[in-house]
Amino acid sequence: MRDFFAAGGVPTRSAGDALALRAPGPPTREMTRILGLYDLAELDRLEQFYEGGRFWISLDPEAGLDSELEQRGFTANDAWQKFERGVEPHPAATALRIGEADDRLGRVFAEAYGLSPSTFATGWISAVVGRDGWHAFAAFDGDEPVATGALYAVDDSGWLGLAGTLPSHRGCGAQSAILAARIDRARELGLRRLVTETGTPRDGIPGPSYRNIVRSGFEPVYLRPNYAAPA
């Protein structure tokens, strides 16, 4: 996430191992949060970064800070399922063409989530195209990109994210095929491990993202709790 924020020129703040993220616009659990928190003294230093506004803490379950955060008024606010797999090939078929994304990446991603194409995030997300360590893909219907996904590679590991599909092209196998392309790229790069995450099943029913991830060979490894700061 540090490099993703750097790509958009969005400042972050660090304290020890912890990293505070704060994207422009309304706060969201994904983009207004603290990562890598293992010491409450670091939280004391980072809270001021949010200027009294809302933020979340994505907590490593091994940090052992759950009870301390609850004592401070933080509340559990949905966990994320973390997944991991190797780089073995994953067969996937679609009538869409899968290829390298271009500067339309951000627009398609924004529209996939109902955001205005003029939002700040559009240019920010497109900034990862061609950036060191990033490998952005799209599914194309003719010449038009209709779905997105990216791989960020560091050392022998890769993170998969920025997945989105336009409503008009959901159910066409775009995300499974983009997942397969990113796995292939990871193998070409000599990576050994891939990680990703998504929301947990609601009422025991997994969402489309969860199902696509599992179908592509990822194994659930742990739940990462998110804690909302007191209002």
Which residues fall in each region the model found?
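A short helix-loop-beta-strand connector motif used in the catalytic cores of GNAT acetyltransferases and
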Residues: F4-G16, E51-R54, N77-W80, V128-F137, ...
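Short amphipathic alpha-helix that is part of the acyltransferase structural core
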Residues: T32-A41, W80, P89-G123, A127, ...
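A conserved beta-strand-loop-helix scaffold within acyl/acetyltransferase catalytic domains
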Residues: S116-S168
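Conserved acetyl-CoA-binding loop-helix of GNAT-fold acetyltransferases
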Residues: A41-E47, L162-T165, G171-E188, R211, ...
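N-terminal charged segments
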Residues: M1-E51
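Acyl-donor-binding surface of acyltransferase catalytic domains
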Residues: L37-D102, T196-E197, R202, P206-V214, ...
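Conserved beta-hairpin
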Residues: P11-G16, P61-R72, G133-A147
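Conserved acetyl-CoA binding element of GNAT-fold acetyltransferases
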Residues: P27-Y38, D156-P167, N226
